[in-house]
Design a protein with these regions (language model features):
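Helix-coil-helix junctions within alpha-helical repeat/solenoid scaffolds
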Residues: 1-180
């Protein structure tokens, strides 16, 4: 099995340190051997794990590397996810970066919609809605999410769409000035 995927599985099953080590070993080997097939995806998987483990600054550095790879290679397949993760990293780093985080997340929504990548648009819109809720901006928090959620015609039993529905309900019932 690919060390990156093995690391991801270990990470998700609770072996965070071992999982991160496996992923980092794979990324380092890919860098050494100039292996570039889906390298942006691999970097983003690693960045997501770093972010989940609380290593926001390190995750942000890995996302920056992925964004650079996307720019140089011209491969735009994971561009929206890179923008979403950049926004998530900034949001996790605190108040001073919230406006910039919102811009990155809005960009992720726009890119994924332009590409017709509805699942990525949903993920980005959920991140943007959560950020706006956390900032007490309930009025516009769910606008993009409602639009994207309404575009789905199937899959309503999937975790992503169920989570989106719950978030929309939380936004609708939230009091102004309070978190969703």
């Amino acid at each position: 099995m690919c060390p990156l995927l093995l690391g991801w599985v270990r990470f998700e099953e609770g072996e965070q340190a071992a999982g991160l080590r496996d992923m980092e070993t794979h990324i380092a080997a890919a860098r050494r051997h100039a292996r570039r097939f889906y390298f942006d995806y691999e970097l983003l998987v690693f960045a997501q794990a770093l972010l989940k483990s609380g290593e926001q600054e390190r995750a942000s550095e890995v996302v920056a590397e992925a964004l650079e790879f996307i720019e140089v290679s011209g491969s735009r397949l994971y561009e929206a996810e890179a923008h979403r993760l950049k926004g998530a990293c900034l949001a996790a780093m605190g108040e001073k970066d919230m406006a910039e985080a919102e811009r990155w997340l809005a960009s992720a929504v726009a890119i994924s919609q332009r590409q017709g990548a509805l699942p990525l648009a949903l993920r980005a819109a959920m991140s943007l809605a959560r950020l706006r809720c956390d900032r007490g901006q309930h009025a516009g928090a769910g606008a993009d999410l409602r639009l994207i959620y309404g575009s789905f015609t199937e899959g309503f039993g999937t975790p992503e769409l169920e989570n989106a529905k719950v978030l929309l309900e939380e936004i609708a019932s939230a009091s102004p000035g309070k978190r969703c």
